[in-house]
Amino acid sequence: MSSHIQIFDTTLRDGEQTPGVNFTFDERLRIALQLEKWGVDVIEAGFPASSTGSFKSVQAIAQTLTTTAVCGLARCKKSDIDAVYEATKDAAKPVVHVFIATSPIHLEHKLKMSQEDVLASIKEHVTYAKQLFDVVQFSPEDATRTELPFLVKCVQTAVDAGATVINIPDTVGYSYHDEYAHIFKTLTESVTSSNEIIYSAHCHDDLGMAVSNSLAAIEGGARRIEGTVNGIGERAGNAALEEVALALYIRNDHYGAQTALNLEETKKTSDLISRYAGIRVPRNKAIVGQNAFSHESGIHQDGVLKHRETYEIMTPQLVGVSTTELPLGKLSGKHAFSKKLKALGYDIDKEAQIDLFKQFKAIADKKKSVSDRDIHAIIQGSEHEHQALYKLETLQLQYVSSGLQSAVVVIKDKEGHIYQDSSIGTGSIVAIYNAVDRIFQKETELIDYRINSVTEGTDAQAEVHVNLLIEGKTVNGFGIDHDILQASCKAYVEAHAKFAAENVEKVGN
């Protein structure tokens, strides 16, 4: 019988530290609901003491989820722990995650503390946290660069103070397979407790070994894996949870351990994070990449046609990738469209379906057939427009002279107020973005601009992702349309709208 490996998802906390990623309040809540549907055991929803926005989103997630444990991060500071308590007290299973750095380089250059000071802080703050929480998780930050004897002392101190989950972070992705496994073996053999202690692994991918090291931790005695969807995170990212889960599933003969994830929700979860983070999943990404189940070589194609297992160790259906798609067309009616939404896993009320059906018919008039990816794109675009404080109403472009273009942009806010401005630029995109900047009265820097086609062919819808720097803060925007310029404008307006929402601003103020 396989042992259970808990999955601790930190997409909303560590994943959001990815440069350029800044989830909105609504996006955080939608992500948390999908993670619960996927079946993760614990969601690290944020760092409540870091900002009012983080506190409110953690609180909302705690009040919304029904089965998943909701965790908040806290430094060894009582005010941090209090903030986590207030944010998560309504959760079905509240958890606090207390951490302090333990490596020599952190003690000397960051904390300016001695080892004795660190041990005293661990004892004081884990003891305090245990008074408020049934479950306290402790992490010695930069554990893999901490001398092993001192690491054992830190963990023993935390356990004696009441911690029942011990997380060992490879904070800078420094460790390797055997070394990381040895740390867990040493801790499980050396640390004593009358309570059951769950050891957890948290790996970064700086040397490309986050998933490998996570699996090594299981071999060393870990029973929980921390990571993010698609492996997003600061620098090179975190362990990709979907890769860990499928490795355990496919190689159960070796690991003898399984997660409780609903694997059929894997692709949908990956797509959601990709969309909200504005980070396209690489085509060759394991498990969820577009090429994961593609075969170009003639020999490989021949083998797969004869027997799929000749070159595939898992089926697309296992992770929720459909291979029996029945596209819709311009003659498809509301009933067929509604059935398609259910088949794709969407639970959308009838009123919302009316607007989605109108968008579907508009696309069907332009395309021979509407694929599942088109349907997903329609819903994605609708979600973004529904959340936005401002949305694009009309866009007019005109060629002026000498390569200059003129753009007139009209946007509308949720109260129905109309805002309009115009500008010129060396090309359509520059003109459009200058006009939008004039409407919002903000100077911006365009950090990233990417166009992706939703499907193949010249009639494909275009997805545009932008990343802007506004007043020192990065925000991303997403737009989708058959017209690339319309999609580009929608994405730019959404990025501005996100900044305005988070800074409680109105256009023209």
From Swiss-Prot:
Q: What does it catalyze?
A: 3-methyl-2-oxobutanoate + acetyl-CoA + H2O = (2S)-2-isopropylmalate + CoA + H(+)
**InterPro entries xref list:** 2-IPM_HCS-like, 2-isopropylmalate_synth_dimer, Aldolase_TIM, LeuA/HCS_post-cat, LeuA_allosteric_dom_sf, LeuA_bact_synth, PYR_CT
The entry's function note states: Catalyzes the condensation of the acetyl group of acetyl-CoA with 3-methyl-2-oxobutanoate (2-ketoisovalerate) to form 3-carboxy-3-hydroxy-4-methylpentanoate (2-isopropylmalate).
Chain residue ranges for the region called Regulatory domain: 391-509
Protein name as annotated? 2-isopropylmalate synthase
Q: Name one GO cellular component term.
A: cytoplasm
* Subcellular location as annotated: Cytoplasm
What family name appears in the similarity comment?
Answer: Belongs to the alpha-IPM synthase/homocitrate synthase family. LeuA type 1 subfamily.
Q: Which cofactor does it need?
A: Mn(2+)
Q: Name one GO molecular function term.
A: 2-isopropylmalate synthase activity
Q: Which NCBIfam families match?
A: leuA_bact (TIGR00973), PRK00915.1-3 (NF002086), PRK00915.1-5 (NF002088)
Subunit structure comment from the entry: Homodimer.
